[in-house]
């Protein structure tokens, strides 16, 4: 798993090193569709977990990923989420929904319930 998280741009096939290409596919032979897509799904779940009316951000962030950002991730309920984190804590969140709905957002140990309006971006900053 540790080598799986190593970013690589290698184009040749090699049985050593492993890693991940920019498109999130595995950099090792043979091509395994379950491993490639399964890994992308696992990374998504580490960053955001959602169910109807609830979104949890950074539930399982690796220690090595202290700072980062995500753009355009989909949560259940057709909610698009962008967020940034610093030192492992959420700094900024943007949400946009295709329809009106109530959703509880949990991050940094805080839960907030908000009402989303169709195609209107909602911003939250945590400092």
Placement of each model-derived feature along the sequence:
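Non-catalytic C-terminal accessory modules of carbohydrate-active enzymes
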Residues: 1-127
